[in-house]
């Protein structure tokens, strides 16, 4: 949606006020639109920066359930040629003999698809721009949130006031909406950081995702599609201790690749970097509740986990699927979308799943 159209829609009271227009927040807006539910989507980031080449080297494993959701909101066809099927997962202890392979039965298809986060953002943003039920407000900072008996509102830094029936916190781990609500949060750090890098390599990966365990943490290689030049590619997620992270990031490209090769052996032959490296701290967090008066949390705003199982985004997308089902039922029954009983249904539906998956991946 263009800035002009979003500006015209600013005065309209919409059904949802989604704060956070990332992968989970924008998917929610698109999924809600399939049920005729309108939304304001507010994000402080610049879409041009988020979709720029080299901005974010991260990639995500998309499960079958998440792929079905993408199909329902109309972006699967655009994404299909950009994804790489995960045919199997190889797990090994420091490349020692005794590798374990997890491979689905022939009738089960693949273990998921790998996508660069940039490609996911581009598909979501393009779809949102074409959806009249979504008023998108990028480059916008929220200065005030209000929840009353009759609705919710958010005031932006430029004085614009957005109104809706239900407030959705989708800003990620540091969600201001969650913090302002006072919901309890269990949180602890792991004392590790994930080093992220894109690799090009001599030999094809054949759809294999590698999980190589070292004392300091897992070293993962996730298969990506070959690039336009035909280079075989993988995404690297290398877990290092917090005390070693700065040193690893400071290594020259040549020294960094030498360390990478030492840990992955010769499985892909010669490797090279395809872009800049990045790193982020690893931690666990989970809210005591995912709902409050006229408010719900989705994605990392409600739960954040170790990336070892690659389930963080998929868990957030399951939040989206459940919330849209609940909201669709509320709309069918003629209820206010902020109805407390309907929100309790979402809380009950998602609470056990998010709690069990989060703790199962707590390392």
Region annotations inferred by a language model:
Residues 11-12, 71-72, 82-180, 188-193, ...:
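Conserved N-terminal helical subregion
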Residues 246-341:
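FAD/FMN-dependent oxidoreductases across multiple families
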Residues 70, 151-155, 161, 166-277:
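Conserved FAD-binding catalytic core of PHBH/FMO-like flavoproteins
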Residues 56-80:
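N-terminal glycine-rich dinucleotide-binding loop that anchors FAD/FMN and/or NAD(P) in oxidoreductases
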Residues 14-41:
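N-terminal Rossmann-like FAD-binding beta1-loop-alpha1 element of flavoenzymes
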Residues 325-363:
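C-terminal helical "tail/cap" subdomain of flavin- and related membrane-associated enzymes
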Residues 33-56:
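Glycine-rich FAD pyrophosphate-binding loop
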